[in-house]
Amino acid sequence: MEKGDSAIELEKKFSRGKTYLLSENGFFLFRFVDGAFGSKWCGFWDRDLKFLEYFAFRVDGEWLCPENFKRFIYTGAEALHIHSLFVGEVTERVVVGDGTLIVNLKLPRRCEVLVEVGVNIRRREEGIHGRVYNIISRSESVEVMNELGKIEIGVRGGEFLPNPRREIHFPGRYAMEHGYDFRWYEDEQEKFIPGIFRFEGRELKFWAGKKAGAGHILRKKRRKLKEKEKKTENWKLASTLLSFYFEREYAGFLAGFPYFNQFWTRDFLCMFTPLIRAGFEREAHKALLAIARHQLSDGSIPVIVGSEKPCADSTPLFLLACYKAFKSGRKAPMKNVKMALQYGVEHFDGELVEHDPRTTWMDTLRRGYAVEVESFWAKAFEVWGKLFKNKKLLFLSEKIKESLISSYLQSGVFLDSLKGKYKFSVNSLIPLTYSVVRTDEENIFKRAKEELFCNFGVRAISRREVGDDYHARIWGISTYWGLKFLSRHNPEEARKIFVNYLKFMGSRTVCGFPETMKESGEVEGASSQLWSVAFIPEMLQELWGRGRS
């Protein structure tokens, strides 16, 4: 740590169940604050490809472990684990760079240190895979590879003693014991241990991936943090938002950690405007152009960049983001815009745009003609119709708006969908929140206040219709949409809810915001989600007129 660095410090008694994340350009380390690699999602990753299960140090016969863990310090650029051993205090300093993981171990005196590394080169969705590993041994390093990839691991000034073996273990038992929910899908994993590193001295440097200097990496990361902190006015927000972004063969934002470690177009496009307002204008526009390059041949936008899986809402959201980019003076991918518009035209059935009912943001529910999807299409046809002076697009927009009023509006409230299980949801607010149609808002505001709002967020589905089912809970995206609607009617109430929402920062992952919460306050799902945090600077600006530390 350098003098002047902002930091979070956690003593052992306050660290139970907490995790942290160090990320750089798609490479990330996810781990428990007490040093445990207690989940199948813990370890060193390159986006959705895992490389390391864990690394472990034995100092003069004593392993660094949660039992002798003492204190944790996090700056966003580095993490420090302080352990109390028989030999004295040992500090483990961890840094992640572009393609590299570096750990410096500072010892109280000259000690013998053994280093064990569990390798598990696998895809994100895999468990035990049985791939064959090969190793190339060197004096102070070893290269481990299988058909998916390879990684070099080393200890500077150490000696590598090859003894390859593979074992089955269940790291997720630790996460389950610490209250992590079933959506982490913990199961048995395999680890390949290539051998042991032996080292003697007072300071050990362990590295995995590319060889690099920790000092250079830290200077670069601190510069980035300072630059973004000026925009967000909060170093924690700056650190968290930076963790999602990568710029490799294409640019993008990972949807969430630890297991939404892919570029989900919907999540990003919902947060396109908030990211710009958070000071990520360059990054957001680069990611938008990457989505354009991965557009499917029929003109639609897939749910995940690089996949063929369809998505109900990403295509109109893409059109709205491109329009915003164009109006701000940025170059918009017009060929892709026209393809996406044509896709919408071809799927217009006379009143609405057809979509797969299984591919809305509530993807565990079937929601045919979802109100938010139709609203996004109506707005997309409207803005591009005006820009292109295209009467057909304007006609389609008006037809969808007419259907929203005639088919969805019942007793002053918009239905969630025409073919779905639930009637009133946060999606019902979208036609008004995004100024798609105009109607009296008194009844929908009253219903939203009674059925969707709680003291720290906004439910996705009416509490009158369902309890704490998965998609009914308080989500980051539902809170964003709900607060935008509420701020028009009762900004003071919106401020109160938002202030309470902010208290969930770091509830599981240091500086991160969880994917979803129950009304009881119990957090669930991914522990650091893009659309749970990216809108915070925008709401601070809208509700207070400025940033807030």
Region roles according to the model:
Residues 248-258, 265, 360-364, 463-467:
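Short glycine/proline-rich turn/loop motifs
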Residues 215-261:
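An acidic-aromatic substrate-binding cleft motif
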Residues 1-231, 266, 277, 281, ...:
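Terminal accessory carbohydrate-recognition/targeting modules of carbohydrate-active enzymes
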Residues 114-117, 218-219, 285-288, 393, ...:
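Composition- and surface-driven signal marking solvent-exposed, interaction-prone regions
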Residues 6-51, 56, 189, 287, ...:
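Aromatic (Trp/Tyr) and acidic
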Residues 301-302, 342-345, 349-359, 366-370, ...:
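Catalytic cores of carbohydrate-active enzymes
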Residues 216-235, 273-289, 438-447:
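Carboxylate/His-rich catalytic cores and anion/metal-binding grooves
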Residues 261-355, 370-374, 473-487, 491-499, ...:
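Aromatic-rich carbohydrate-recognition surfaces in CAZymes
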